[in-house]
Design a protein with these regions (language model features):
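PP2C/PPM-type serine/threonine phosphatase catalytic domain
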Residues: 1-175
Length: 175
């Protein structure tokens, strides 16, 4: 039987092949790649996969980042060179170390996390997290917990007001 993790791995590998082939066939697209984050909830478990610096968060009582960025600044945090708080403003914040479509194969990181009714799941691109601190994301989501559409709009608005120049992707789901 196909597991959620194997389903993610197969879907991401298929997407990777498409992007990689496009980049190989069209000189103007050479070197292109993208990030991906996906989630699937089954019973009381969320299965998550990511590549790059798009993130998955769970809001239970507090906002918790589940995924780990595939980025130079994340490696700098892990090695103790910089503090986590410095990631958003670091000059190398946009250098990712793993992407979809840049190599002929790619492997996502996969996570499993327990979820409960009332939890809020957030999947987002770095267009949000480079502009809005986690504490502010948590505040906005908590204040708008009854209206996920409004919460999403407010997160995008906050990123834009902070000077957002990147694409901002936000998916919110309340269980």
């Amino acid at each position: 039987a196909r597991t959620p993790v194997s389903a993610f791995e197969q879907a991401i590998e298929a997407a990777n092949q498409k992007v990689y082939q496009c980049a190989k066939e069209d000189f103007d697209l050479a070197g292109m790649g993208t990030t991906v984050v996906g989630a699937m909830v089954e019973d009381d478990v969320a299965y998550i996969a990511n590549i790059g610096d798009s993130r998955f968060y769970r809001l239970h009582e507090h906002l918790e980042q589940i995924t780990v960025d595939h980025s130079l600044v994340e490696e700098m945090v892990q090695s103790g060179e910089i503090q986590k708080e410095e990631m958003r403003t670091h000059p190398n914040k946009n250098i990712i170390t793993r992407a979809l479509g840049t190599d002929d194969t790619v492997r996502p990181d996969c996570f499993e996390v327990k979820v409960e009714p009332g939890d809020v799941l957030l999947l987002c691109s770095d267009g949000l997290t480079n502009m809005v601190e986690d504490s502010q994301i948590e505040k906005i989501v908590k204040e708008n917990k009854e209206d996920m559409k409004l919460a999403g709009e407010k997160l995008v608005q906050q990123a834009n007001e902070a000077g957002g120049k990147d694409n901002i992707s936000v998916i919110l789901v309340r269980l």
